[in-house]
Design a protein with these regions (language model features):
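Alpha-helical substrate-recognition element adjacent to the catalytic core
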Residues: 2-105
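Short loop-to-alpha-helix "cap/lid" segments that border enzyme active sites
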Residues: 106-121
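Glycine-rich phosphate-binding loop signature in dinucleotide/nucleotide-binding domains
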Residues: 61, 118-127
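Acidic, Mg2+-coordinating phosphoryl-transfer loop and its flanking beta/alpha structural elements
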Residues: 126-159
Length: 159
């Protein structure tokens, strides 16, 4: 199995920053400059840590079993890696896949291309991928490919 984790809304709480990228006056530079402030979402990070412990003992794929697929821009790669390391979510070199700096397509389109590339590079079929995702459009896209999707409730949702 490959385990695919989204970051924002699954591992990192960024609701306090969303005003920067919603509406007409989107300020992605400001958003990306502040994502290091994100607080960890305990439930998502605990699931990741548990899978990480199992994956280390039973690693089946040469590039590792855990991938991070995010709509974040490559501009934020170092900040994202530091955040993942700080919160115990990865080792030194995470399998981190991000959108290119100038790519402004919707997240589900970006992630579709990324997941296709991961499948081609690893030879792992979509049916052997477990995805943790909070965005409904992205979750639907993953499901349409045949991935097993754990649709994470948005961090602001109430029970």
């Amino acid at each position: 199995m490959l385990y695919i984790f989204d970051i924002d809304g699954v591992l990192a709480g960024v609701t306090h920053l969303l005003y920067l990228i919603k509406g007409e006056n989107k300020d992605y530079d400001a958003y990306y400059s502040r994502i290091g402030e994100a607080l960890p979402i305990a439930q998502g990070c605990e699931v990741l840590r548990a899978i990480t412990m199992c994956a280390w003992t039973q690693q089946t794929y040469p590039h590792g079993d855990i991938y991070f697929v995010t709509g974040r821009s490559e501009l934020s790669r170092e900040t994202t890696i530091k955040w993942l390391q700080k919160h115990g979510a990865c080792g030194e070199r995470p399998n981190l896949h991000m959108r290119s700096n100038k790519d402004r397509r919707p997240a589900h389109e970006v992630k579709h291309d990324i997941i296709q590339r991961i499948s081609q590079e690893t030879g792992v079929p979509f049916s052997d991928m477990v995805v943790f995702e909070d965005d409904p459009q992205c979750a639907k896209m993953y499901e349409s490919l045949g991935c097993y999707v754990c649709h994470v409730r948005h961090e602001k949702a109430k029970s």
